[in-house]
Amino acid sequence: MAAGMKGKRSRRRKERKNVEHGCAHIKSTFNNSIVTITDSVGNTLSWASAGGLGFRGSRKSTPFAAQMAAETAAKVAMEHGLKSIEVYVKGPGSGREAAIRSLQAAGLEVTLIKDVTPIPHNGCRPPKRRRV
């Protein structure tokens, strides 16, 4: 770095987008749930995850944690003027339905629910079975 320069980065203030319709992408795995709300183009408005909200360990994978993540993401997205969403659900986790219900309860109108879980046509070898 130059002699007079400090390690300071100028941070741009987030501009307030005004979006009526968007998409909610819910990724629910066996270990965590991530909710991302985007506009119709795909630019992220807000996101939240169960782990980011302070849930740790086995509590991260609960439906309640997914519900809280969806609620948090919905509140921030509604500040951008969001009113209706299409929901895309991915993964086998337990928080799928809870997250969708939470988005509806937050005051967003759900226009479409679609399962976009990737299904292999005999691709990679799955992990070995757990023996407990």
UniProtKB/Swiss-Prot annotation:
It comes from the Bacteria. Residues 1-20 are annotated as: Disordered. GO terms for cellular component: ribonucleoprotein complex; ribosome. One of its GO terms (biological process) is translation. Gene3D superfamilies: Ribosomal protein S11. The keyword RNA-binding applies. One of its GO terms (molecular function) is rRNA binding. Residues 1-16 have a biased composition (Basic residues). Transmembrane segments: none annotated. Keywords: Ribonucleoprotein, Ribosomal protein, RNA-binding, rRNA-binding. It holds the Pfam family Ribosomal_S11. Part of the 30S ribosomal subunit. Interacts with proteins S7 and S18. Binds to IF-3. Belongs to the universal ribosomal protein uS11 family. HAMAP family: Ribosomal_uS11 (MF_01310). Located on the platform of the 30S subunit, it bridges several disparate RNA helices of the 16S rRNA. Forms part of the Shine-Dalgarno cleft in the 70S ribosome. This is Small ribosomal subunit protein uS11. It comes from Clostridium botulinum (strain Langeland / NCTC 10281 / Type F). The gene is rpsK.
